[in-house]
Amino acid sequence: MQIQETVPLDAPEHCPGPSSENAGTASACEGCPNQQICASAPRGEDPDLPLVVERLKEIKHKILVLSGKGGVGKSTFSSQLAWGLSLEEDKQIGLMDVDICGPSIPRIMGVEKEEAHQSSKGWSPIYVCPNLAVMSIGFLLPSEDSSVIWRGPKKNGLIKQFIKDVNWENLDYLIVDTPPGTSDEHLSLVQFFKNSGIDGAVVVTTPQEVALQDVRKEIDFCRKASIPILGLVENMSGFVCPSCKGKSNIFTITTGGGEALAKEMGLPFLGKIPLDPLIARSCDFGKSFIDECPESPASEIIIDIINKIDESLQKRQ
């Protein structure tokens, strides 16, 4: 299995990448042995872009899952969204993990020991059930503890490979789990998805203002990049006692939480998912929480959010 190199191994730390408009001319290029090669290379649109767009157009629905801050449960929500959509056995679901420096999807989906293999049709994603396929850099690393220390152009190259070289097999839904914030991975996704009919993004937050202030930036990014926002999800919204069913707020809500922010920004509010220790347990063991704990209040709310997203997408057709 080969990851295509887009940045020379002897390039300086802040190399803009050989396909960049600044290749060979940026200040970071001074003293690089490849400077003349990059400076004289032809400029223009990425030659792979038409193929990438064509592959994406074959997928009926494409959803980005975003968060402004790390640790709000974005990957957990991405996994439950994929599990929930896969309950319709006639639908094909793909889950693509582009959190390249911190891939957690393999563990959450229970396939952390698997390796991706190549066939005549391209890379084969890992199937967690007959209609749910997963792809992550975690399947390409020598061990779970291996770090990924990459510049932006190399991340861009891998995301491109995940789209054009993975045999996704006629997907109905592609869920893309992204890193927190607005990083190189997000810019690559915008470049690849903007001409392929992306359905939109689901933004995940927790109730406290320190998370909400970063979500405002994420919403601003989506609007500047012309990415529709399907709605806002408030995660870790209180704790429901499994014995008495009483609810306690873990995070102090000082500015109204996710629901108030959605109203302020003119966005659909999809729901509040309470804390449930069994969610973390399900993720650690690679199980579907909504299958393992169908009577949990959190499970019922997750299913309701998934139904809202699905209904919204069906209305857009």
Curated annotation (Swiss-Prot):
Transmembrane segments: none
Cofactor binding comment, as recorded: Binds 4 [4Fe-4S] clusters per heterotetramer. Contains two stable clusters in the N-termini of nbp35 and two labile, bridging clusters between subunits of the nbp35-cfd1 heterotetramer.
Entry annotated with the keyword ATP-binding: yes
SUPFAM superfamilies per UniProt: P-loop containing nucleoside triphosphate hydrolases (SSF52540)
Name of protein: Cytosolic Fe-S cluster assembly factor nbp35
Organism the protein comes from: Schizosaccharomyces pombe (strain 972 / ATCC 24843) (Fission yeast)
Subunit structure: Heterotetramer of 2 nbp35 and 2 cfd1 chains.
Primary localization class, coarse: cytoplasm
